[in-house]
């Protein structure tokens, strides 16, 4: 209800869909989103098989991102950006009560230094939500990560993952290239 799926970007009723998204945002702003998290949300999704997938939900500085071909910021896409899809997405953002652009960020973290240490301390975190996902998607739960020490730990892990030394060690064939901290 809060996003315009790509399949509908060029539909004739896209404007109506955007209006519905804005109405849903207004509803969520007053009825659902009752607490802002000043930090990250640690998320665990338990699949039907029992496998637990961990992640962090947070915000990124768009000044550290570029989709331009040849650009080498710390955060960049793993594939070409389809620029024709940007205007319909901007239509959703114009007049929106919430900022809800979303992307999956990927970190090459073989040492498990970013997410897993937070998960090891989830008992110390305040649980924000928990529930079953639809269509056999499993179970999901989220915890607020607001402790200054944990936030510093996340920042340090990201800095280490984005260091030239770590990048050169992981990717000797690209030694000296601008490090990629997060891929979109």
Regions found by a protein language model. Give the residues of each.
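A short, charged helix-loop
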Residues: 126-155
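A sequence-level detector for short glycine-anchored, His/Arg-bearing signature motifs
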Residues: 93, 135, 149-152, 156-159, ...
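N-terminal extension/subdomain marker
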Residues: 1-136, 174
């Amino acid at each position: 209800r809060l996003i315009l799926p790509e399949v509908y970007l060029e539909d004739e009723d896209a404007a109506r869909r955007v209006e519905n998204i804005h109405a849903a945002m207004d509803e969520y702003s007053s009825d659902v989103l009752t607490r802002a998290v000043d930090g990250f949300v640690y998320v665990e999704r338990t699949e039907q098989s029992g496998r637990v997938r961990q992640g962090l939900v947070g915000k990124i500085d768009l000044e550290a991102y570029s989709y331009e071909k040849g650009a080498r910021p710390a955060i960049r896409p793993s594939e070409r950006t389809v620029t024709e899809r940007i205007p319909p997405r901007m239509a959703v953002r114009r007049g929106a009560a919430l900022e809800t652009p979303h992307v999956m960020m990927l970190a090459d973290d073989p040492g498990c230094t970013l997410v897993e240490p937070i998960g090891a301390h989830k008992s110390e975190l305040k649980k924000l939500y928990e529930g079953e996902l639809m269509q056999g998607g499993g179970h999901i739960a989220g915890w607020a990560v607001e402790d200054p020490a944990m936030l510093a730990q996340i920042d340090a892990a990201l800095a280490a993952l984005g260091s030239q030394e770590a990048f050169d060690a992981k990717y000797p064939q690209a030694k000296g290239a601008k490090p990629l901290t997060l891929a979109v």
